Design a protein with these regions (language model features):
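N-terminal, active-site-proximal structural segment of metallo-dependent hydrolase catalytic domains
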Residues: 20-127
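Generic low-complexity, intrinsically disordered sequence content enriched
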Residues: 10-15, 73-76, 106, 136
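A generic structural signal for solvent-exposed, polar alpha-helical segments
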Residues: 13-16, 39, 45, 139
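Basic side chains
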Residues: 2-3, 68, 160
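Structured beta-strand-rich core segments of catalytic domains in phosphoester-bond hydrolases
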Residues: 96-171
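Bacterial Sec-dependent N-terminal signal peptides
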Residues: 1-23
Length: 171
């Protein structure tokens, strides 16, 4: 009597364990973060980025830039880790200057698993939206930048567009 009971108990435990693993694998995290003027220290031609250059209004130098990258990486790499150990499948970002800052961000400790999508838009300051994604959790199938329609009274017509990304979650 004892052996069949232990065998049934073993089967129940295995079933619960397999179900928990399946649920854990099906749990994904998504995040959004406004990185608030993530500018590098290099002037972009045809962009109004002078405030974020050495000697500019914010005296934006290598030390400030590097410090901001480290702080952002620390925050982003810890998002949702208690609930989803692998971290977010993707993270939307606002106010990114260009691909150089994203290259630098994904090289920071804790961010190495991420790749990114970003398009240069017409914003006069040069800030754009971007998507960081972990290719082990999310496969990009298509992406594009959709420019916003000018609104009544808009005289510049130069603003960030909408980043549209299609993809599949990993199974």
């Amino acid at each position: 009597m004892r052996k069949p009971f232990l065998f049934i108990l073993f089967l129940v435990a295995m079933s619960v364990s397999m179900q928990a693993q399946r649920l854990e694998r099906d749990l994904y995290s998504v995040a959004f973060y406004n990185v608030e003027n993530l500018f590098d220290t290099i002037h972009d031609v045809n962009k109004d980025d002078a405030e974020f250059l050495p000697g500019g209004r914010y005296d934006w130098g290598t030390r400030k830039y590097t410090s901001k990258l480290k702080r952002l990486a620390q925050v982003l790499s810890e998002l949702s880790r208690t609930e989803v150990p692998q971290g977010p499948a993707f993270i939307g970002l606002a106010e990114v200057e260009n691909s150089r800052v994203l290259d630098d961000l994904v090289k920071q400790p804790g961010m190495e698993q991420y790749r990114y999508i970003q398009y240069e838009g017409p914003d006069k300051r040069g800030i754009d939206c971007a998507l960081l994604y972990d290719p082990s959790q999310y496969e990009i199938t298509a992406s594009k930048l959709v420019l916003s329609e000018p609104f009544e009274g808009d005289t510049t017509h130069l603003t960030r567009g909408f980043l549209i990304v299609d993809g599949r979650l990993a199974n």
